[in-house]
UniProtKB/Swiss-Prot annotation:
Part of the 30S ribosomal subunit. Forms a tight complex with proteins S10 and S14. GO terms for molecular function: mRNA binding; rRNA binding; structural constituent of ribosome. The lineage of its organism: Bacteria, Pseudomonadati, Campylobacterota, Epsilonproteobacteria, Nautiliales. NCBIfam families: rpsC_bact (TIGR01009). SUPFAM superfamilies: Prokaryotic type KH domain (KH-domain type II), Ribosomal protein S3 C-terminal domain. This is Small ribosomal subunit protein uS3. Signal peptide: none annotated. It comes from Nitratiruptor sp. (strain SB155-2). The keyword Nucleotidyltransferase does not apply.
Length: 229
């Protein structure tokens, strides 16, 4: 079962938190889900080169907070915050309500499964050999200190007439172990021969503590006590 199901969905409430955090009325549920999908698609298209690894959407009665986790936050913010204001206006026009945008930096982009999948897809579109693209991403992830990584590509690889699936695995990726922290990413490469699907699983270690850990908040720096002369 662990081999087939989405590893993030399987671990929700165990060691993964939801990416859409809100509680609507039952009648408004389809509308909110569709709106979240629109926001994610818009941001992915608008900020493709910023290297977005995750988008978290939180809602209150009248406000909407969007947290964007990106490898290159400077592209989103722009000079003196000009680009982020334009983005905010576009999002408000899209959803029709007040939007707050929070930007977080992805500190280890090589260890993000979504960014790794997009990296392989980009290389395939540039006609790089699929084996070379996969090995390059695996080496980068291992340097970032991950415990294991699996990369899978499926489609008309190398322009072959018949589609097939190829994958590489380095280290451990225990998909059945629920306490294992598994990151998962998917991307599509649009080539002249057709669409090639890219899937990446990254094992980051085991979470032995039960429940979802709260996100770490930045603590104010304490000043060192002055010495009396």
């Amino acid at each position: 079962m662990g081999q087939k199901v989405n590893p993030i969905g399987l671990r929700l409430g165990i060691n993964r938190n939801w990416e859409s955090r809100w509680f609507p009325d039952f009648n408004k549920m389809p509308e909110r889900v569709e709106e979240d999908n629109k926001i994610r698609k818009f941001l992915k298209k608008e900020l493709y080169y910023a290297g977005i690894s995750n988008i978290i959407i939180e809602r209150t009665a009248k406000k909407l907070r969007v947290t964007i986790v990106a490898a290159r936050p400077g592209i989103i913010i722009g000079k003196k915050g000009a680009d982020i204001e334009k983005l905010k206006q576009k999002l408000q026009k899209l959803v029709g309500k007040e939007v707050f945008i929070n930007i977080k930096e992805e500190k280890r982009p090589q260890a993000s499964a979504q960014l790794a999948a997009e990296n392989v897809a980009t290389q395939l579109e540039r006609r790089v050999a699929f084996r070379r693209a996969m090995k390059k991403v695996i080496q980068a992830a291992q340097k970032a200190g991950v415990k294991g990584i699996k990369v899978q590509v499926a489609g008309r690889l190398g322009g072959a007439e018949m589609a097939r699936t190829e994958w590489y695995l380095e280290g451990r990726v225990p998909l059945h172990t629920l306490r294992a922290k598994i990151d998962y990413g998917f991307a599509e490469a649009h080539t002249t021969y057709g669409v090639i699907g890219v899937k990446v699983w990254i094992f980051k270690g085991e979470v032995l503590q039960k429940g979802i850990r709260p996100e770490p908040t930045e603590r104010p720096r304490r000043r060192a006590p002055r010495r009396r002369s």
